[in-house]
């Protein structure tokens, strides 16, 4: 059997022992070794050899064999052409790529196998069809150009028609965080090592060197982009940045087998305007995962796919640009007046994904039903614009001016396309009657054929006197006159036998044959005419590409902000303020997910962090008391403020925060051989090395997984570091000894979460109170968890014995415990250690004592 090794060498080796069709297949397959080849044969796409085995497993289809070639059976699997989209979608969603090989030659004129060639490559990030895409998520292709230990990164949201350039990255960890934040469907790179390691756990491939040639990059930029845009890009960016941009354009050109004309904009992401959150913190804070308790699932109630995707972009890149935030807040307030957003959301709910529809037009993958959806969506725009004009603010007017009322296009589509068109243009039936006179005439020939056949049949019955004569049609033999064999003696000479059946004969006459030729010819001509009209229509639609893209972007923006206005009222959110006083003052803060999922009222808490008072809170109290919730809700509030949403607090005055770091939870990294403690220390080291005075740091119980003294020592050292750097830090701990730091550092304060005991039960107050906790309540929490009574009684006795022996509660011992071994010995200690008391004289001792006193 042939193997992948054979594919690699197919061109170089003798393949003459195979059938001509398999020879053709192997030559094509050798050019697409790492992806599945869908090879068109009649009404099926067939896969052979290892591709067939893989497809059978992935798609749960039958693996068969197609005869023999080179003396061996050929594994084969196939899917129907008309149903291929659903199968391709399954493969693409698994992160795999496909080459579509179509029959491009004419079977009637071909000598040997019909000519075939790959007309399209489908990869996870380069799809535009609705079946392949998540409506609420961008389809992201990332390109990474590694050079001199630096990473140049660009990405495109394929159907959005834009390429974004990211700042140059200098570490693998920074690269990993940036890529995972984008959550791409596919990654390309010039680095084979990076592709092999794949730290992103996403589909990644290393491309040939020419894709990352600066010369080729500039060529593709010039060929793919509008002249003015291309010239601007070439003058604006450095060579390595241009190489990265060009790699995306060259890759798309190769995939599409055409120039990616739908790319109309290149922009640079300014990091200094962004609130940075690494991937671990995103996971810890449950910002945008797929769970029902994620912040995105609670905040994201947009009415359009356009808005849902834009909201995800807001979540990926929260902005610190106060002008942008002020604009969003102004619009939210305007739309919230008299709940005006409700009328807007009602209109938005009728608008389809016009951004992706117009991209499909540009990419040649649009379907007739897409054009109907486009028309219906554009019909909503006058209503939407009128509603927006009722709120005559500069901010809303600016958005409204970018929504284009495309009445001419609506009229064109309404006249051209029937209301419920077929899935494809392949068999016609898409263009509305009355749109094209020539097409109507060609269709009328077929439509009027029934009347002709009725009259023709009646005339033949009268002519030969046989009432059972029938005129019919089948796809194989065409039109015919059918007579029983018992009437063979009455057959006119002009009847020519066409088909013999068991009890009857079928005939054709010259008149019927001429009619058949006319009808079949009209069908072919009508189909050709309809396809020509359809192609011409698409060319007309694409003239509105930029206007529709701009309209789509504006609809997305108003959808997100109407959603924010609705959420503000529904969830009782308030508008945050921003200050330049290095102060974070929050009142009655709530955790939205927990509030949403509990029956009893949520207990809010205040938080105050300030450079003038305290920047670090040591948070103590029992498990389940509310420490983690308190810290998370502060971080989530800051995040919401920086995406432009209102926030879950009665009052929020926020200073400039550039990064949110969190160290929460405990888990092993088994695949990398790292223990829970090692994972914790690695993440802590990352935070310590990167945090600044503008950071918000969440640290939850640092120092677990090692000995008590080691853990306490590390926790204290970390807390001191954060206190010294002035980062706003919420530091939860069960090491009560850390509460002593408030006496040593003026910017450290203690808060704790209270619990009340009644008999043997514990009741959590979930309220943050100034000062340190006095107990941990671990045994009481264990009781709530269901630990058996005998174990609890034993634990109580153990606790009593330990507390009795424990001397660390004395303040002097606490201080002693904090005295970690110094890195250098005290000079006085060195002098004393050097004295030999067995040989020193009393006079020498007095002199030494005098010297020490002078020091």
From Swiss-Prot:
Keyword ATP-binding among UniProt keywords: yes
GO annotation, biological process: mismatch repair
SMART domains (alphabetical): MUTSac, MUTSd
GO cellular component: cytosol
Molecular function terms, GO-annotated: ATP binding; ATP-dependent DNA damage sensor activity; damaged DNA binding; mismatched DNA binding
KW ATP-binding (keyword) present: yes
Keywords: ATP-binding, DNA damage, DNA repair, DNA-binding, Nucleotide-binding
Cystine bridges: none
Top-level lineage group: Bacteria
Pfam family, one: MutS_III
TM spans (from-to): none
Binding site for ATP: 621-628
Role according to the record: This protein is involved in the repair of mismatches in DNA. It is possible that it carries out the mismatch recognition step. This protein has a weak ATPase activity.
HAMAP family xref list: MutS (MF_00096)
The family this protein is said to belong to: Belongs to the DNA mismatch repair MutS family.
Official protein name in the record: DNA mismatch repair protein MutS
Gene this protein is translated from: mutS
């Amino acid at each position: 059997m042939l193997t992948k090794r054979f594919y690699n060498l197919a061109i170089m080796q003798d393949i003459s022992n195979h059938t001509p069709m398999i020879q053709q297949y192997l030559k094509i397959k050798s050019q697409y070794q790492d992806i599945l080849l869908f090879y068109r044969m009649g009404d099926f796409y067939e896969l052979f050899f290892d591709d067939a085995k893989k497809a059978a497993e992935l798609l749960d289809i039958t693996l068969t064999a197609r005869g023999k070639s080179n003396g061996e059976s050929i594994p084969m699997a196939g899917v129907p052409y008309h149903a291929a989209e659903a199968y391709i979608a399954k493969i693409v969603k698994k992160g795999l790529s496909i080459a579509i090989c179509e029959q491009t030659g004419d079977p009637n004129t071909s000598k040997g196998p019909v000519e075939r060639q790959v007309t399209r490559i489908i990869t996870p990030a380069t799809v535009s069809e609705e079946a392949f895409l998540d409506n609420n998520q961008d389809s992201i292709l990332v390109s990474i150009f590694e050079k001199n230990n630096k990473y140049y990164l660009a990405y495109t949201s394929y159907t959005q028609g834009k390429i974004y350039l990211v700042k140059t990255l200098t570490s693998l960890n920074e690269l990993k965080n940036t890529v995972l934040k984008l959550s791409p469907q596919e990654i390309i790179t010039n680095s084979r090592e990076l592709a092999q390691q794949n730290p992103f756990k996403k589909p990644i491939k290393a491309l040939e060197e020419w894709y990352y040639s600066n010369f080729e990059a500039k060529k593709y930029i010039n060929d793919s982009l509008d002249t003015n845009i291309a010239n601007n890009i070439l003058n604006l960016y450095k060579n390595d940045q241009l190489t990265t941009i060009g790699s995306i354009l060259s890759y798309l050109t190769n995939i599409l087998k055409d120039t990616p004309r739908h790319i109309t904009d290149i922009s640079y992401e300014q990091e200094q305007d962004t609130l940075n959150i690494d991937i671990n913190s995103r996971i810890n804070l449950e910002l945008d995962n797929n769970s029902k308790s994620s912040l995105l699932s609670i905040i994201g109630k947009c009415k359009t796919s356009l808005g849902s995707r834009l909201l995800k972009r807001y979540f990926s890149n929260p902005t610190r640009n106060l002008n942008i935030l002020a604009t969003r807040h102004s619009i939210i307030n305007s739309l919230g007046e008299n709940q005006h957003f409700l009328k807007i959301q009602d209109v938005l709910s009728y608008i389809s994904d016009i951004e992706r529809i117009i991209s499909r037009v540009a990419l040649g993958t649009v379907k007739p039903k897409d054009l109907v959806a486009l028309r219906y969506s554009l019909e909503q725009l006058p209503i939407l614009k009128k509603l927006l004009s009722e709120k005559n603010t500069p901010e809303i007017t600016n958005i409204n001016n970018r929504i284009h009322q495309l009445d001419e296009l609506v009229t064109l589509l309404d006249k051209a396309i029937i209301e419920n068109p077929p899935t494809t243009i392949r068999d016609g039936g898409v263009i509305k009657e009355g749109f094209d006179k020539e097409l109507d005439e060609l269709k009328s020939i077929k439509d009027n054929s029934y009347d002709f056949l009725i009259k023709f049949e009646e005339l033949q019955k009268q002519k030969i006197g046989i009432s059972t004569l029938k005129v019919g049609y089948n796809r194989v033999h065409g039109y015919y006159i059918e007579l029983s064999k018992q009437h063979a003696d009455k057959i006119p000479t002009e009847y020519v036998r066409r088909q013999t059946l068991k009890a009857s004969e079928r005939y054709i006459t010259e008149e019927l044959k001429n009619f058949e030729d006319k009808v079949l010819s009209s069908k072919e001509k009508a189909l050709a005419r309809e396809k020509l009209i359809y192609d011409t229509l698409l060319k007309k639609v694409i003239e509105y590409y930029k206007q529709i893209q701009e309209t789509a972007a504006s609809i997305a923006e108003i959808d997100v902000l109407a959603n924010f206005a609705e959420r503000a009222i529904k969830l009782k959110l308030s508008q945050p303020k921003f200050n330049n006083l290095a102060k974070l003052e929050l009142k009655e803060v709530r955790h939205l997910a927990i509030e949403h999922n509990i029956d009893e009222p949520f207990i809010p808490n205040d938080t105050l962090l300030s450079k003038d008072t305290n920047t670090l809170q040591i948070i103590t109290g029992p498990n389940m008391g509310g420490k983690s919730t308190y810290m998370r809700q502060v971080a989530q509030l800051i995040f919401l403020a920086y995406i432009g949403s209102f926030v879950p607090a009665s009052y929020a005055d926020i200073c400039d925060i550039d990064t949110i770091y969190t160290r929460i939870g405990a888990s092993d990294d088994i695949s990398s051989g790292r223990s829970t403690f090692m994972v914790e220390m690695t993440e802590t080291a990352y935070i310590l090395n990167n945090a600044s005075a503008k950071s918000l740091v969440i640290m939850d119980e640092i120092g677990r997984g090692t000995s008590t003294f080691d853990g306490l020592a590390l926790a204290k050292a970390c807390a001191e570091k954060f206190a010294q750097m002035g980062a706003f830090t919420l530091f939860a701990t069960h090491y009560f000894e850390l509460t002593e730091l408030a006496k040593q550092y003026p910017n450290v304060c203690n808060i704790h979460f209270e619990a009340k005991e009644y008999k043997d039960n514990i009741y959590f107050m979930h309220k943050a109170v100034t000062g340190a906790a006095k107990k941990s309540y671990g045994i009481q929490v264990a009781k709530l968890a269901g630990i058996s009574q005998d174990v609890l009684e034993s634990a109580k006795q153990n606790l009593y014995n330990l507390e009795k022996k424990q001397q660390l509660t004395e303040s002097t011992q606490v201080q002693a415990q904090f005295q970690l071994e110094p890195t250098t010995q005290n000079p006085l200690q060195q002098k004393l250690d050097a004295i030999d008391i067995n040989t020193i004289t009393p006079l020498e001792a007095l002199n030494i004592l005098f010297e020490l006193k002078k020091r």
